[in-house]
Each structure stands twice: as C-alpha cells, then as structure tokens.
From Swiss-Prot:
Protein name according to UniProt: Putative UPF0479 protein YDR545C-A
The organism's place on the tree of life at top rank: Eukaryota
Keywords associated with the record: Membrane, Transmembrane, Transmembrane helix
Residue intervals passing through the bilayer: 38-58, 135-155
UniProt membrane topology term: Multi-pass membrane protein
Subcellular location: Membrane
Miscellaneous information on this protein: Completely overlaps YRF1-1.
Family: Belongs to the UPF0479 family.
Gene Ontology cellular-component annotations: membrane
Lineage: Eukaryota, Fungi, Dikarya, Ascomycota, Saccharomycotina
Length: 159
C-alpha cells in the first residue's frame, strides 16, 4: 500500500473513532497496520456500554469504500449482538470480526498477540482501557463485581 494512502487511512480511522463518540478522544486509537490488514479494536465492556458501534462502522464504510481493495479491516471483540445486526454492513466493506472471549479454539487470539508482541492479553486490555477511555482498571473491576452481584441477587429474588 502506498505510504500516502497508509497515512490517509490512519487519519480516517482516527476521525472515525472521534466521530463515533466523545469518549474516544485519544488520536492514537488502537489502529495498527499488519500486512494487508487494519486492526481496529473495540474492547468488550466499552464496546457494549460506551461506543456507538454502528456509527463508527458506518463512518468507516463510507470513508473506506474507495480504498477497500488495499486492505481488510478486522474488528476484535465486537459484541455478538452488534455483529449479528451489522453483518451486511461489515461484509460490504470486507470488515472481518472476531470475539477474543469465544475464539481461543479457532486460533484468533494468537493473531492479536502477534500484533502486539510485547504484551499478553491482560496488559493489552489494561492499555486499551487506560489510554483510549481514561478509565482506571480498578473501577472496571468494581463495576464488574457489582454487575455480577446484581445479576445473582436478581436471580435469587426470582427463584
């Protein structure tokens, strides 16, 4: 891919992230080139609760239609409910997606590790949360514990 086109694509990714939501203010929003692929990561919790995924993807598709032959966009950790609803949109722009939490059996997780050679998955996610979302990991832990407690208490009330 020509260097100028690479730069244009990276700028597009950055503007797409900002276009999607004000929580993505960091201009280095986890976009990486790897051979013929662009990797665009949406961590599970923020993607589920904070990021309007459809807006981001529509913006990406509009901006990338002309250069689609040069690359494949890969989305990691796209929640399944978004993936199902957006399947035609994803296919139209050659966007592939996978969910880290359910893909260990088909070899997708090592492909993430190969892109980020010096981090395993835990620091990788910590870095996503802290840099892209400015949310300290401890608060995410507290939220998860509270959420699990809420689900358990609701379940026990109904039984």
């Amino acid at each position: 891919m020509p260097a100028k086109l690479q730069l244009d694509v990276l700028r597009t990714l950055q503007s797409s992230a900002r276009h999607g939501t004000q929580t993505l203010k960091n201009s280095n929003f986890l976009e990486r080139f790897h051979k013929d692929r662009i990797v665009f990561c949406l961590p599970f919790f923020p993607a589920l609760f904070l990021v309007p995924v459809q807006k981001v993807l529509q913006h990406l598709c509009l901006r990338f239609t002309q250069v689609a032959p040069y690359f494949i966009i890969q989305l990691f950790d796209l929640p399944s409910r978004h993936a199902e609803n957006l399947a035609p949109l994803l296919a139209s722009c050659r966007i592939q997606y996978t969910n880290c939490f359910s893909s260990s059996s088909n070899g997708q997780v090592p492909s993430i590790i190969s892109l980020y050679l010096r981090v395993d998955l835990s620091p990788f996610y910590a870095k996503i949360f802290q840099i892209s979302y400015r949310v300290p990991m401890i608060w995410l832990d507290v939220f998860q514990v509270f959420f699990v407690f809420l689900v358990i208490s609701q379940h026990s009330l109904h039984s």
